[in-house]
Structures are given as structure tokens and as C-alpha cells.
């Protein structure tokens, strides 16, 4: 099978994936502050976080993570990251990863930040019920890019 026809599976992200996640971050967040492997290892070690990966032919081609906020219900959640290998973008992998995060957060309000110029991500988030609730100026420290804060209510069925 070729990369175009190899099935993509979604499953748990592990510490063994940290290096590949960092490699993808470096491709995806050029000019910003991509996470190194140690950051992924810290995220994966937290009991409040849930991370998933997308694999094609045994290669990690995408990742996503969310954190549960607070110690007692009702919980709120924050999407920490979603990334898909540029060679695999446009195939619905980001949507599948996001769906896994939203399933984990079922019943809770979910927040995220997204670059104001990331039209593809903004369209994806809107399509599953996220709404803009704020603007964070110079949120991305290295590039100085702005971010929207978005929120998806707990009752959103999408």
C-alpha cells in the first residue's frame, strides 16, 4: 500500500512517540515555539491529560491532546495541541483526532486557542460547535501571532 491508500488508525499516544511528535511540531509550528520531546513526555505523564495518535503504516502522522481542568465535576477541558503531518493534511485526520478528544470530554465545556490566521483549523473547530469567545494578542511568543480563544459548550451534540 502507498501512503495514499494505507489506512490511518487512531490510538493512544505513548512516551515512545514523543520524539516523532516533536519532529512534527517542528514542521507544523515553524517560527513559533514547537514543543520538544520533553514537553510531550511531561504532557503524557499527567493523569489529567488524554493524548491520541494517528498512524499510517506504523508511522505516527498526527497527534492530539486535551487536559481535564479542576479536581471535581463539572469538569472543563482544554485542547492542548493537534497536529497532522503536512503530507497527510486534508484527509480528515485532524477531524478524527479532535473527535477522540471531544469524546473524552463528553459532558464538559471545552476550550482551545488557535492562531487567528489558521483558516483550516478555524473551519474545523466551528464545524464541531466551537465559537470564538476571545482574542489573545501575541499569544504565540516567538512569532507574536494572535490567537482566538474558542469554546464548545457541553451540550453541543456535534
From Swiss-Prot:
Q: What is its EC number?
A: 2.3.1.255, 2.3.1.258
Q: Which terms in the Gene Ontology molecular function aspect does this entry carry? A: protein N-terminal-methionine acetyltransferase activity; protein N-terminal-serine acetyltransferase activity; protein-N-terminal amino-acid acetyltransferase activity; protein-N-terminal-alanine acetyltransferase activity
Q: Which PROSITE patterns match?
A: GNAT
Against InterPro entries, the record matches this protein to:
AcTrfase_RimI/Ard1, Acyl_CoA_acyltransferase, Bact_Acetyltransf, GNAT_dom
Q: Which Pfam families match?
A: Acetyltransf_1 (PF00583)
The record's annotation in Gene3D superfamilies points to:
3.40.630.30
Q: Where is the N-acetyltransferase domain?
A: 8-155
Q: Which UniProt key words apply to this protein?
A: Acyltransferase, Transferase
Question: What is an annotated GO biological process for this record, any one?
Answer: N-terminal protein amino acid acetylation
Q: Which reaction does it catalyse?
A: N-terminal L-methionyl-L-alanyl-[protein] + acetyl-CoA = N-terminal N(alpha)-acetyl-L-methionyl-L-alanyl-[protein] + CoA + H(+); N-terminal L-methionyl-L-seryl-[protein] + acetyl-CoA = N-terminal N(alpha)-acetyl-L-methionyl-L-seryl-[protein] + CoA + H(+); N-terminal L-methionyl-L-valyl-[protein] + acetyl-CoA = N-terminal N(alpha)-acetyl-L-methionyl-L-valyl-[protein] + CoA + H(+); N-terminal L-methionyl-L-threonyl-[protein] + acetyl-CoA = N-terminal N(alpha)-acetyl-L-methionyl-L-threonyl-[protein] + CoA + H(+)
> In its keyword annotation, does this UniProt entry include RNA-binding?
no
Regarding protein family, the annotation reads: Belongs to the acetyltransferase family. RimI subfamily.
Outline what the protein does: N-alpha-acetyltransferase that specifically mediates the acetylation of N-terminal residues. Able to mediate acetylation of a wide variety of N-terminal residues, with preference for hydrophobic N-termini. Acetylates GroS/GroES and GroEL1. Able to acetylate the ribosomal protein bS18, but it is unclear whether it acetylates its N-terminal alanine residue.
Q: How does this polypeptide assemble, per the annotation? A: Monomer. Interacts with TsaD. Interacts with GroS/GroES.
State the name under which the record lists this protein. Answer: N-alpha-acetyltransferase RimI
Q: Which gene encodes it?
A: rimI
Amino acid at each position: 500500500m502507498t501512503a495514499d491508500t494505507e489506512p490511518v488508525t487512531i490510538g493512544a499516544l505513548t512516551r515512545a512517540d514523543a520524539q516523532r511528535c516533536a519532529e512534527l511540531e517542528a514542521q507544523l509550528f515553524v517560527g513559533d515555539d514547537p514543543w520538544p520531546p520533553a514537553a510531550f513526555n511531561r504532557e503524557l505523564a499527567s493523569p489529567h491529560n488524554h493524548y491520541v495518535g494517528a498512524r499510517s503504516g506504523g508511522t505516527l502522522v498526527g497527534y492530539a491532546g486535551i487536559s481535564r481542568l479542576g479536581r471535581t465535576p463539572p469538569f472543563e477541558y482544554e485542547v492542548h495541541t493537534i497536529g497532522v503531518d503536512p503530507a497527510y493534511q486534508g484527509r480528515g485526520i485532524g477531524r478524527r483526532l479532535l473527535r477522540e478528544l471531544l469524546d473524552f470530554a463528553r459532558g464538559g465545556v471545552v476550550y482551545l486557542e488557535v492562531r487567528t490566521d489558521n483558516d483550516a483549523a478555524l473551519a474545523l473547530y466551528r464545524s464541531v460547535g466551537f465559537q470564538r469567545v476571545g482574542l489573545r494578542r501575541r499569544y504565540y511568543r516567538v512569532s507574536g501571532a494572535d490567537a482566538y480563544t474558542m469554546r464548545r459548550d457541553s451540550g453541543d451534540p456535534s
